[in-house]
Amino acid sequence: MSQNVYQFIDVQRVDPAKKPIKIRKIEFVEIYEPFTKQQATAQADRCLDCGNPYCEWKCPVHNYIPQWLKLANEGRILEAVELSHQTNSLPEVCGRVCPQDRLCEGSCTLNDDFGAVTIGNIEKYITDKAFEMGWKPDMSKVEWTDKKVAIIGAGPAGLAAADILVRNGVKPVVFDRYPEIGGLLTFGIPSFKLEKGVMENRRRVFTEMGVEFRMNVEVGQDVQMQELLDEYDAVFLGVGTYKYMRAGLENEDAPGVYDALPFLISNTYKVMELEHNQPFIDMAGKKVVVLGGGDTAMDCVRTSIRQGASNVICAYRRDEENMPGSRREVKNAKEEGVKFMFNLQPLGIEVDAYGKVSGVKVVKTALGEPDDAGRRRPEPVEGSEHVLPADAVIMAFGFQPHQMNWLTPFNVELDQWGRIKAPNNQEFQYQTSNEKIFAGGDAVRGSDLVVTAIDEGRKAAEGILEYLNV
């Protein structure tokens, strides 16, 4: 690192360049250009190497951020990537999709006055560069056991669990209903944030490490849970949350109203040129209204732009300051032509004489007293009802645990919201009420960040290792 203690002043924060707007609006490719070696080195040099690194503590997996920034600054990429993998199973993913402004970069000492260190982009640079250099995990010292674990779900929690298990000599076999690994990383997050080749490469890495993938396999249909319990020493549930939430709006089942996840999955199948048993949902030429204010809503509005929608509106019931989505994603959406309408609460879906969507009836809101979560409640403004014209409406209200009938006979307790009970403060962390079954990620904590799912998958794997006495 630089000996100049004022390097953070001499070198200002610089984010990667973005592709031109006219290209971004039509292509499903990542919008950020990669850092050059010179850019990554200079930006890493801005780190103050704080004695108490708030960035590290704010990170859910507690990455060794100052240490790998120093290694990146010195050009020691292979050492940096080894260090990043000590805490994170998918650093190239987190570097792309984590809301760094709310996590590591938001906690950076330099953030308020000088601009935070570009931690996420350097994390991405380190891993991408290491893969270019031919890096792969060294498995030569692994002492293999005769233990094997079935992992249900190839999303971030399942992949993280597989990573820890295989590094400790336990054979992970991952089952997933989709044709490619990643879960919503692949089929939910659009390519302009996370290109599909990223997960394809990670699949090759995990396979070479000894992880076995059995794709296009639906538990409860293609394989039974009892078979897995009989054949494997333990089972990990990393099934995520796939039930999309509804608002109970009038006419929300009308033709032209879509839930966010089926819309995004449909688009991914088309982008990846995969066969799909559902028709493609196309927004070309349509006036689209997306209801919601989280990252999924941002994915929907930006996907609609790329599909060629004539007009795209994001309607959210609170103000911009209270949007749950990443500020970076909101900014990108605005640049690409999305119109945001804040303090609007949907009341119902308007339909024409044929029953098809013609608009969304909304009411203006004002923020009132805080709710139990500390967020100010949106309160309707009397007499402010009006209609937003629309040919298509996408509802992006979030996700909740989906029903798993195949799990019911196996004494796995759920909480009142349908989440799997798998406490982390017990003898074997993330063990369920069935001693042989462990769980982690969104299925346990509810819909959350990729990095929190990774964290729980890794910790659940540690619990499994202790349970198996490995």
Protein language model regions, located:
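Beta1-alpha1 glycine-rich phosphate/pyrophosphate-binding loop at the start
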Residues: 6-33, 62-74, 83-85, 112, ...
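Ferredoxin-type iron-sulfur electron-transfer modules in oxidoreductases and energy-metabolism complexes
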Residues: 24-42, 64-96, 113-143, 268
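Local cysteine-cluster metal-coordination motifs and their immediate loop/turn environment
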Residues: 45-64, 89-112
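Feature captures the FAD/FMN-dependent oxidoreductase FAD-binding
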Residues: 79, 143-152, 200-249, 348-357, ...
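Residue-level detector of alpha-helix initiation sites
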Residues: 89, 155-156, 294-296, 443-444
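Glycine-rich dinucleotide-binding loop and its adjacent helix/turn
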Residues: 126-143, 204-221, 244-307, 416-428, ...
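FAD-site-proximal beta/loop scaffold in flavoenzymes
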Residues: 253-285, 370-447
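A conserved FAD-binding loop/helix module that cradles the flavin
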Residues: 300, 443-469
